[in-house]
Amino acid sequence: MFVSDNNNPSRDINMMIGDVTSNGDLQPHQIILGESSGGEDHEIIKAPKKRAETWAQDETRTLISLRREMDNLFNTSKSNKHLWEQISKKMREKGFDRSPSMCTDKWRNILKEFKKAKQHEDKATSGGSTKMSYYNEIEDIFRERKKKVAFYKSPATTTPSSAKVDSFMQFTDKGFEDTGISFTSVEANGRPTLNLETELDHDGLPLPIAADPITANGVPPWNWRDTPGNGVDGQPFAGRIITVKFGDYTRRVGIDGTAEAIKEAIRSAFRLRTRRAFWLEDEEQVIRSLDRDMPLGNYILRIDEGIAVRVCHYDESDPLPVHQEEKIFYTEEDYRDFLARRGWTCLREFDAFQNIDNMDELQSGRLYRGMR
């Protein structure tokens, strides 16, 4: 004699189906089914999706699409960590929980797979029969980047040949975990011309794949964030060039000469007719010395504001000051010339007894009087 389980209304039946995957693409999830004592009301509770080690096709295509949209924002001037954080955020908005490092690792593996597929295609007799997934998407990114920098002279009317695409990429024998790996275009002389990513972020994470851009003549060109901006699309600049900004004005300055020549070039570019000291500060607020080996990038021109003081003048017959003069000293030579033209040997702070023999002892905003 068999007794049905349905005859026991007080018994709860719980069924759990968990961690179901198909071909490694589906996201693992949990479904918990609960049955009440009456056997009529069912409740389905979905637990949060866990991040799978493998990427689904939708995830990968979304990552490639987002990376392609932001390709213009990747540059060689600073870290790209914030860009990968934006990509990770957009991935979450589309329902894919992927951290910035996971997105970067996946992108790096896609590039590695593309390189292998391209090598295999070159060995094939006609066109290559085995191609990676998303091959065309990655090739389109290279094609768009190549058009922007215009390093290849031939018109891009057809799909790039195997040799051209292969020359567009340069991989070392090192693994992708090596931070010094390059993924760049290579000219006939073997020098890379195009960088796909930038240097490591400040946390040391292997977010980008970096290489210095080099033109055909072996000299790195300046690469602005969006377009060259020189009136000729994709026309590279010869020599080492930095971008210097002062107020509302921006100039491109060559640094192939000596330190003194670079200073004179900056003075001429911004019409600095005084002998005021100046220096260059990069985007990380680091002051750089002026020489041909300084890093290429964007700089802000800082000019010495000098020391502004007030000097009171007396009449020979009247001990009271006649008037005050505001004076700004920029160099020790300016200070000495000011004293000599008035027949003074030094300055003394008003209502004080210490003589000021050199400019460094002056304090901005103070009132001084001349001493003979």
Swiss-Prot record:
Keyword Transport (UniProt): no
Domain of life: Eukaryota
Gene3D superfamilies in alphabetical order: Homeodomain-like
Name under which the protein is recorded: Trihelix transcription factor GT-4
Pfam families, A to Z: Myb_DNA-bind_4
A Gene Ontology term for the protein's cellular component: nucleus
Main location, first listed in the record: nucleus
Entry GO MF terms: DNA binding; DNA-binding transcription factor activity
Positions of post-translational Phosphoserine modification: 167
Function: Probable transcription factor that binds specific DNA sequence.
Gene: GT-4
InterPro entries hit by this protein: Myb_DNA-bind_4, SANT/Myb
Organism: Arabidopsis thaliana (Mouse-ear cress)
